[in-house]
Amino acid sequence: MAEKKNRAGALQSELRIELHTNYAIGLWEGRKAEKREDGKKGKQPIMGMPQFLHRATQINRDSQQNEPWADMAMLTLEEKIELASQQMNELIASLDKQMSFVPAGVSITDAQAAETLDLTVFSGTPLGYRCVFLLMGFDQYAKRVLQAAHYGVISRSQRYDMLGSGSRLLREIYGSVLRYRKVGATRLDAAEDNETWRTACEAAGEPDRAVLLGEKRSAFSPPVNEASVSLLRLRYKAGQ
Protein backbone atom coordinates (compact mmCIF):
# COMPACT_ATOMS: atom_id res chain seq x y z
CA MET A 1 0.00 0.00 0.00
CA ALA A 2 1.43 3.36 -1.04
CA GLU A 3 2.20 5.80 1.72
CA LYS A 4 -0.30 8.65 1.84
CA LYS A 5 1.19 12.06 1.08
CA ASN A 6 0.43 14.79 3.61
CA ARG A 7 1.89 17.67 1.59
CA ALA A 8 0.89 19.25 -1.70
CA GLY A 9 3.32 19.36 -4.57
CA ALA A 10 5.03 22.54 -5.73
CA LEU A 11 2.70 25.10 -7.28
CA GLN A 12 3.22 25.57 -11.00
CA SER A 13 2.02 28.43 -13.13
CA GLU A 14 2.77 30.05 -16.47
CA LEU A 15 2.43 33.67 -17.53
CA ARG A 16 1.37 34.29 -21.12
CA ILE A 17 0.82 37.66 -22.74
CA GLU A 18 -0.50 39.04 -26.03
CA LEU A 19 0.93 42.20 -27.57
CA HIS A 20 -1.27 44.04 -30.06
CA THR A 21 0.76 47.06 -31.19
CA ASN A 22 4.07 47.39 -32.99
CA TYR A 23 5.07 49.99 -30.40
CA ALA A 24 4.81 47.47 -27.55
CA ILE A 25 6.38 44.73 -29.67
CA GLY A 26 9.33 47.04 -30.35
CA LEU A 27 9.76 47.59 -26.61
CA TRP A 28 9.67 43.83 -26.08
CA GLU A 29 12.13 42.93 -28.83
CA GLY A 30 14.54 45.87 -28.62
CA ARG A 31 17.10 46.08 -31.42
CA LYS A 32 20.32 44.24 -32.13
CA ALA A 33 23.47 46.16 -33.03
CA GLU A 34 23.64 46.75 -36.77
CA LYS A 35 26.84 46.60 -38.83
CA ARG A 36 27.18 48.62 -42.01
CA GLU A 37 28.57 47.07 -45.17
CA ASP A 38 31.44 49.59 -45.21
CA GLY A 39 32.61 48.29 -41.84
CA LYS A 40 31.63 51.39 -39.90
CA LYS A 41 29.45 51.24 -36.83
CA GLY A 42 25.74 51.10 -37.55
CA LYS A 43 22.81 51.61 -35.22
CA GLN A 44 23.47 50.90 -31.56
CA PRO A 45 21.59 48.05 -29.84
CA ILE A 46 18.47 48.86 -27.83
CA MET A 47 17.54 46.73 -24.83
CA GLY A 48 14.33 44.73 -25.01
CA MET A 49 12.30 43.00 -22.31
CA PRO A 50 14.15 39.63 -22.46
CA GLN A 51 17.46 41.40 -21.79
CA PHE A 52 15.84 43.42 -19.02
CA LEU A 53 14.47 40.29 -17.36
CA HIS A 54 17.88 38.62 -17.57
CA ARG A 55 19.60 41.57 -15.90
CA ALA A 56 16.89 41.98 -13.25
CA THR A 57 17.24 38.29 -12.41
CA GLN A 58 21.02 38.71 -12.06
CA ILE A 59 20.53 41.67 -9.70
CA ASN A 60 18.15 39.55 -7.63
CA ARG A 61 20.77 36.75 -7.48
CA ASP A 62 23.42 39.21 -6.32
CA SER A 63 20.98 40.43 -3.66
CA GLN A 64 20.56 36.82 -2.50
CA GLN A 65 24.35 36.67 -2.18
CA ASN A 66 24.22 39.55 0.33
CA GLU A 67 25.66 42.26 -1.94
CA PRO A 68 24.37 45.68 -0.77
CA TRP A 69 24.90 47.33 -4.17
CA ALA A 70 22.46 44.81 -5.63
CA ASP A 71 20.00 45.71 -2.87
CA MET A 72 20.34 49.37 -3.85
CA ALA A 73 19.67 48.44 -7.48
CA MET A 74 16.58 46.43 -6.47
CA LEU A 75 15.24 49.38 -4.46
CA THR A 76 15.88 51.80 -7.33
CA LEU A 77 14.19 49.44 -9.78
CA GLU A 78 11.11 49.09 -7.58
CA GLU A 79 10.85 52.87 -7.20
CA LYS A 80 11.22 53.43 -10.95
CA ILE A 81 8.53 50.87 -11.78
CA GLU A 82 6.18 52.38 -9.19
CA LEU A 83 6.74 55.90 -10.52
CA ALA A 84 6.33 54.75 -14.12
CA SER A 85 3.04 53.04 -13.22
CA GLN A 86 1.74 56.29 -11.72
CA GLN A 87 2.84 58.25 -14.78
CA MET A 88 1.22 55.70 -17.09
CA ASN A 89 -2.05 56.17 -15.21
CA GLU A 90 -1.71 59.93 -15.71
CA LEU A 91 -1.21 59.41 -19.45
CA ILE A 92 -4.31 57.20 -19.57
CA ALA A 93 -6.31 59.84 -17.66
CA SER A 94 -5.15 62.48 -20.14
CA LEU A 95 -6.28 60.29 -23.04
CA ASP A 96 -9.64 59.70 -21.36
CA LYS A 97 -10.06 63.47 -21.17
CA GLN A 98 -9.33 63.76 -24.89
CA MET A 99 -11.86 61.01 -25.63
CA SER A 100 -14.58 63.06 -23.93
CA PHE A 101 -14.65 64.99 -27.23
CA VAL A 102 -16.62 62.08 -28.70
CA PRO A 103 -20.33 63.00 -28.37
CA ALA A 104 -22.99 60.86 -26.75
CA GLY A 105 -24.54 58.37 -29.12
CA VAL A 106 -21.22 57.46 -30.73
CA SER A 107 -19.98 53.97 -29.90
CA ILE A 108 -16.39 52.97 -30.66
CA THR A 109 -15.49 49.33 -30.17
CA ASP A 110 -12.14 48.21 -28.75
CA ALA A 111 -9.43 47.89 -31.38
CA GLN A 112 -8.12 44.37 -31.93
CA ALA A 113 -5.00 43.37 -33.84
CA ALA A 114 -5.56 40.95 -36.72
CA GLU A 115 -2.51 39.06 -35.47
CA THR A 116 -0.92 39.36 -32.02
CA LEU A 117 2.50 38.46 -30.68
CA ASP A 118 1.92 35.67 -28.15
CA LEU A 119 4.63 35.15 -25.55
CA THR A 120 5.39 33.06 -22.49
CA VAL A 121 7.21 35.07 -19.82
CA PHE A 122 9.52 33.97 -17.01
CA SER A 123 11.30 36.23 -14.55
CA GLY A 124 13.59 35.34 -11.66
CA THR A 125 12.23 38.30 -9.65
CA PRO A 126 8.72 39.70 -9.07
CA LEU A 127 9.99 43.10 -10.24
CA GLY A 128 10.47 41.58 -13.69
CA TYR A 129 6.80 40.62 -13.84
CA ARG A 130 5.78 44.07 -12.64
CA CYS A 131 7.68 45.59 -15.55
CA VAL A 132 5.95 43.16 -17.94
CA PHE A 133 2.59 44.28 -16.55
CA LEU A 134 3.62 47.88 -17.20
CA LEU A 135 4.43 46.94 -20.81
CA MET A 136 0.99 45.36 -21.13
CA GLY A 137 -0.55 48.57 -19.82
CA PHE A 138 1.40 50.53 -22.42
CA ASP A 139 0.19 48.17 -25.15
CA GLN A 140 -3.44 48.85 -24.21
CA TYR A 141 -2.71 52.58 -23.99
CA ALA A 142 -1.02 52.56 -27.40
CA LYS A 143 -4.05 50.83 -28.95
CA ARG A 144 -6.32 53.56 -27.66
CA VAL A 145 -3.96 56.35 -28.79
CA LEU A 146 -3.83 54.91 -32.31
CA GLN A 147 -7.60 54.54 -32.32
CA ALA A 148 -8.09 58.13 -31.11
CA ALA A 149 -5.83 59.40 -33.89
CA HIS A 150 -7.66 57.30 -36.49
CA TYR A 151 -11.00 58.88 -35.57
CA GLY A 152 -9.60 62.41 -35.39
CA VAL A 153 -9.92 62.77 -31.63
CA ILE A 154 -6.22 63.67 -31.39
CA SER A 155 -3.81 65.04 -33.98
CA ARG A 156 -0.86 63.23 -35.55
CA SER A 157 1.60 65.23 -33.46
CA GLN A 158 -0.37 64.42 -30.30
CA ARG A 159 -0.26 60.75 -31.23
CA TYR A 160 3.52 60.95 -31.63
CA ASP A 161 3.97 62.74 -28.30
CA MET A 162 1.66 60.41 -26.38
CA LEU A 163 3.28 57.23 -27.68
CA GLY A 164 6.73 58.68 -27.06
CA SER A 165 5.85 59.59 -23.48
CA GLY A 166 4.55 56.09 -22.80
CA SER A 167 7.46 54.21 -24.36
CA ARG A 168 9.96 56.45 -22.55
CA LEU A 169 8.69 55.12 -19.21
CA LEU A 170 9.75 51.59 -20.15
CA ARG A 171 13.08 52.65 -21.62
CA GLU A 172 14.02 54.52 -18.45
CA ILE A 173 13.41 51.34 -16.45
CA TYR A 174 15.53 49.35 -18.89
CA GLY A 175 18.28 51.92 -18.47
CA SER A 176 18.37 51.47 -14.70
CA VAL A 177 19.41 47.81 -15.00
CA LEU A 178 21.72 48.51 -17.95
CA ARG A 179 23.87 50.65 -15.67
CA TYR A 180 24.16 47.96 -12.98
CA ARG A 181 27.51 46.26 -12.46
CA LYS A 182 28.23 43.37 -10.10
CA VAL A 183 30.60 44.52 -7.36
CA GLY A 184 31.43 41.22 -5.66
CA ALA A 185 31.60 42.35 -2.03
CA THR A 186 29.14 41.35 0.70
CA ARG A 187 27.98 42.62 4.07
CA LEU A 188 30.33 40.11 5.71
CA ASP A 189 33.20 41.83 3.91
CA ALA A 190 31.85 45.14 5.24
CA ALA A 191 31.69 43.77 8.79
CA GLU A 192 35.33 42.68 8.50
CA ASP A 193 36.28 45.89 6.69
CA ASN A 194 38.63 43.78 4.59
CA GLU A 195 40.51 44.48 1.38
CA THR A 196 37.65 43.16 -0.77
CA TRP A 197 35.29 45.65 0.83
CA ARG A 198 37.63 48.63 0.59
CA THR A 199 38.44 47.88 -3.05
CA ALA A 200 34.73 47.57 -3.88
CA CYS A 201 33.95 50.89 -2.19
CA GLU A 202 36.72 52.60 -4.13
CA ALA A 203 35.36 51.22 -7.40
CA ALA A 204 31.60 51.62 -6.84
CA GLY A 205 31.32 54.09 -3.97
CA GLU A 206 30.09 53.20 -0.49
CA PRO A 207 26.54 51.85 -0.44
CA ASP A 208 23.79 53.75 1.32
CA ARG A 209 24.11 53.10 5.09
CA ALA A 210 20.37 52.45 5.53
CA VAL A 211 20.45 49.89 2.70
CA LEU A 212 23.60 48.31 4.10
CA LEU A 213 21.92 47.84 7.49
CA GLY A 214 18.73 46.49 5.93
CA GLU A 215 16.66 49.49 7.02
CA LYS A 216 15.80 50.48 3.43
CA ARG A 217 14.97 47.60 1.14
CA SER A 218 12.79 46.74 -1.83
CA ALA A 219 9.60 44.96 -0.85
CA PHE A 220 10.50 42.40 -3.54
CA SER A 221 14.10 41.72 -2.48
CA PRO A 222 15.14 38.42 -0.90
CA PRO A 223 15.27 38.53 2.94
CA VAL A 224 18.31 40.38 4.26
CA ASN A 225 21.08 38.33 5.91
CA GLU A 226 20.36 39.17 9.55
CA ALA A 227 23.62 37.69 10.88
CA SER A 228 25.76 39.99 8.75
CA VAL A 229 23.58 42.99 9.61
CA SER A 230 24.07 42.26 13.32
CA LEU A 231 27.85 42.15 12.81
CA LEU A 232 27.71 45.45 10.94
CA ARG A 233 25.75 47.10 13.74
CA LEU A 234 28.38 45.95 16.23
CA ARG A 235 31.13 47.33 14.00
CA TYR A 236 29.52 50.73 13.63
CA LYS A 237 28.64 50.84 17.33
CA ALA A 238 32.25 50.10 18.24
CA GLY A 239 33.41 52.84 15.88
CA GLN A 240 31.32 55.52 17.55
In which residue ranges do the predicted regions lie?
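Short, hydrophobic/aromatic alpha-helical segments in well-folded domains
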Residues: R144-V145, M162
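Polar/charged low-complexity regulatory segments
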Residues: M1-L134, Q140, Q147, G166-Q240
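Short, solvent-exposed positions on alpha-helices
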Residues: S157-Q158
